[in-house]
């Protein structure tokens, strides 16, 4: 699957977002090495803390099906905003644990895209090693 196909699938997920408060729809597509993929959309709640972001939705779905970080090929996150989608702090922390450090992460909107990694997005990570 090429990058544009991933972006298109992620926009399909964004179209299913539940964002009545922010109207900021985000979608994600997590491609696995075996060719399967998982979609995620942001799901908002009147109690904002209960909102779940698109990238966490996709990664959690994959984990629910038994996939783990070594099974992932690429994560793609998109939005309809003026700037490319970028994971929030909570998502960066979650992705730092549930993705390999060098897993490509495609960030895009309708006009632009870039490829990064969680190591680049969150250089000083809090890990289980910090609790020892």
Where are these regions (language model features)?
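Generic helix-packing signal
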Residues: 14-17, 32, 44, 62-66, ...
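Compact, glycine-rich, soluble single-domain proteins
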Residues: 42-56
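Active-site segments that bind and position negatively charged phosphate/pyrophosphate groups
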Residues: 22
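Short beta-strand scaffold segments in enzyme catalytic cores
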Residues: 25-32
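C-terminal binding/interaction regions
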Residues: 2-19, 70-132
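Short, solvent-exposed cationic patches
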Residues: 54-74
């Amino acid at each position: 699957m090429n990058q544009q196909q991933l972006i298109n699938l992620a926009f399909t997920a964004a179209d299913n977002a539940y964002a009545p408060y922010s109207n900021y729809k985000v979608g994600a597509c997590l491609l696995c090495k075996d060719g399967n993929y998982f979609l995620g959309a942001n799901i908002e709640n009147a109690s904002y803390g209960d909102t779940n972001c698109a990238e966490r939705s996709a990664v959690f779905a994959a984990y629910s099906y038994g996939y783990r970080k070594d099974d992932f090929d690429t994560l793609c996150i998109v939005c309809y905003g003026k700037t490319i989608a970028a994971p929030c702090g909570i998502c960066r922390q979650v992705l730092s644990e549930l993705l390999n450090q060098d897993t490509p992460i495609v960030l895009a909107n309708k006009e632009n895209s870039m490829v990064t990694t969680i190591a680049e997005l969150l250089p000083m990570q809090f890990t289980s090693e910090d609790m020892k």
